[in-house]
Amino acid sequence: MKKIFSIFDFYIKSSLHLSFCVLSLIVITYLRLDQEINFLILFVVFNATVITYNFIKYASTLPYYFFVSNISIKKIQYLSFVCGIFLIISIFFLNFNTILFGFFLSFFCFIYVIPFNRTKRNIRNYSRIKIFIVAFVWASVTVWFPLTINNEIDYLNSFLVFLQRFVFVVAYTLPFEIRDLKYDSIKLETIPQLYGIISTKKIAYFLLILFVAITFIIQPFSISFIIGDLLIALLTSLMILKTKENQKKYFASFWVESIPLVWLLLMVFLILTTF
């Protein structure tokens, strides 16, 4: 049992779970826009997500991150190194537009952690805009990036899916902001710090209503996607309702984070069963 728990803990801390959640959102994009699933894109994004999030998590320990003796951190380093090799190899199979857009998104990830001016502040320190930049990058990675490999794109519907994804990610991120209240410096001025937990939850509920409203605009009109989006909005609302500052260890990092996986499974089930 201890071994299973150790593997599960590594699965969470190494960003593997998060990477599968990101892939779920990409597959949802393909399904929503009736595009063929590109497994090379999924492979690239999976490896890039593991590397990026492990870098973000442990960047505060730089340069000591590369010389740590902690076994669990070393395992994460090895995983990131292997993913890095896979990512470099896979880049050679992408087209120029996809590579260019990938570097554009990588730039945001880089300045999220690395200071970009003399004040030694990075995007992570600008908390009033941080959550929106995170949502922009997530929405771009899971909507625009997969479409760069296609020649025929419905730009209106793609933009609506991007907008819906952006709204969803902001709401989806707020439980993590609430969880981190006891760790974040008051100077960060996160949404829960500025408006309180109750008001933060109200903001999330409003965003989820907007998320559902956008569903009715996206074409073609599909009962499967509407039901799926309604149910996932309800599930996310329930998770937000249950979110509190002092929560169980894996509530946010596993259960809340798993919402995109549930969303994908729900979508596949509804597509296969709805006439």
Tell what function each PLM region has.
Residues 49-81, 170-208:
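Solvent-exposed interhelical
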Residues 73-149, 238-239:
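Intramembrane alpha-helical segments
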Residues 2-18, 61-79, 114-136, 190, ...:
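Interhelical loop and helix-boundary elements at the membrane-water interface
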Residues 24-44, 88-100, 140-163, 214-225, ...:
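Helix-coil boundary and interhelical linker segments in multi-pass alpha-helical membrane proteins
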Residues 190-239:
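Glycine/small-residue-rich hydrophobic helix-like segments
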Residues 10-17, 24-26, 30, 43, ...:
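Hydrophobic alpha-helical transmembrane segments of membrane proteins
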Residues 47-59, 106-118, 140, 165-181, ...:
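Transmembrane alpha-helical segments that form the membrane-embedded catalytic/substrate-channel core
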